[in-house]
Regions:
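C-terminal (or distal) subdomains of carbohydrate-active enzymes
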Residues: 1-280
Length: 280
């Protein structure tokens, strides 16, 4: 897996469309390679690449007990579109062939066939496999995935000239995660959520305290449902939004870090519904 520099047809390219590919060149000219971090919990390697007039600093990070490799990209992009449109992509070769790809969409996921065009995915693309683990590619900020029989790709930079002639020049910071999962929609959603929501922390000195070493505001137990948002309401309550990921009926159990006096089901407009809700 790695970066690929593409030249695409200007006539069929725009800010919204990736044009017909004319040339694909792997970004493999590594001018510097160094160990960034060496430790029991985290190890990383940083590689510096040159591509045409641009440079890419790529850090590969592997952390303890993590199933995905984190790829931190810092690209100084200087390419300008003219007769051809320069495009930078990430390509993940597959060890198997497939024509089914799962992508997350608002309030769920969808499975699409492989086509020679980018399709939208909010945070991840997954190349589904009938037997065995499925390759998954997660992004923090890019949405144009392309599933093909033997690869799972993601467009990172598209230097189109329409409508803006200089849209992408400058420093781009992008984080990707590459790994494997079972192919289950809920597991993929949990993986993408975990990757994109870092732990917030506050350093301090050593002292005594009354709070437990670990706690949680809310957690969910469900076969196929996930939490998508937790927010306060105007009347002082807590609103928990969620969705079912597989198109099935699924019971949901929410556990809070405090006593719950009352609970009710509401729709997207916070109107009360008749769905059964129990508290204990």
């Amino acid at each position: 897996a790695g970066l690929v520099y593409q030249e695409t047809e200007c006539k069929t390219s725009s800010a919204w469309n990736i044009g017909r590919a004319i040339k694909n060149v792997p970004v493999d000219r590594c001018v510097e390679l160094s160990r960034a971090v060496i430790g029991e919990l985290r190890s990383s390697v940083t590689a510096h690449f040159t591509v045409e007039n641009s440079t890419a600093e790529v850090t590969y990070v592997l952390e303890k007990d993590q199933s995905l490799v984190r790829v931190e990209l810092k690209v100084d992009w200087k390419e300008i579109g003219k007769d051809i449109i320069p495009v930078l992509t990430w390509q993940t070769p597959l060890s198997y062939q497939t024509d089914a790809f799962r992508y997350d969409v608002p309030a769920g996921s969808t499975v699409r066939r492989g086509i020679n065009n980018d399709v939208p995915g909010l945070r991840y693309g997954m190349a589904l496999r009938m037997d065995g683990s499925s390759a998954i590619l997660v992004s923090d900020s890019k949405y144009g995935y392309r599933g093909q029989k033997e690869s799972l790709n993601l467009t990172l930079i598209n230097s189109s000239v329409s409508p803006d002639p200089y849209p992408e020049r400058g420093i781009h910071t992008i984080t990707l995660w590459v790994g494997a999962a079972s192919g289950d929609a809920k597991e993929a959603e949990d993986i993408a959520t975990g990757c994109n929501h870092k732990i917030f922390y506050q350093p301090t000195n050593c002292h005594h305290g009354e709070l437990p070493l670990e706690d949680s505001l809310v957690s969910v137990a469900s076969h196929s449902a996930v939490i998508t948002a937790v927010q306060p309401t105007t009347d002082g309550c807590v609103l928990v939004r969620g969705c079912e990921t597989s198109g099935e009926r699924s019971a949901v159990k929410l556990s809070f870090g405090t006593e719950v006096k009352e609970a009710q089901a509401v729709d997207l407009f916070e109107k009360t519904k008749d769905n059964a809700v129990e508290t204990d």
